[in-house]
């Protein structure tokens, strides 16, 4: 009678214990890959801004640091803002699109994440003007000054309500 070290199941499949043990690390890597891909790709965000605007560039860096994958159009933002239906009075120096929502101005990444999680029926978020202390307007050139400001939820009809108030302390 011929004896082997294989169990009946491994003999039937031709897969030995060593082969199986060697494949386990590869299986672990394969299972981890989707999360690795998600971690490196981030949430896509498209931005229209003036090529010479430093605060817009700093806001883009803020969004990238928060895990967004940013595509920048250095063509200005007036045309895209008008095309998307944002009232001029809510305008700022850059306009973005993420997850079907418009983001106008220096909106903190945490507020954009909250918007994407809550999924309200709205045009998007806006921080009119350029409040000092908001992301992108918070560098050393501003002397660590942080003014209070509101992030507005903009309805499709152009009306607004406060989405989140920032009291002048460090925003995320």
Question: For each of these PLM feature ranges, what is it?
Answer:
Residues 49-52, 56, 86-89, 105-109:
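Solvent-exposed, acidic/flexible segments
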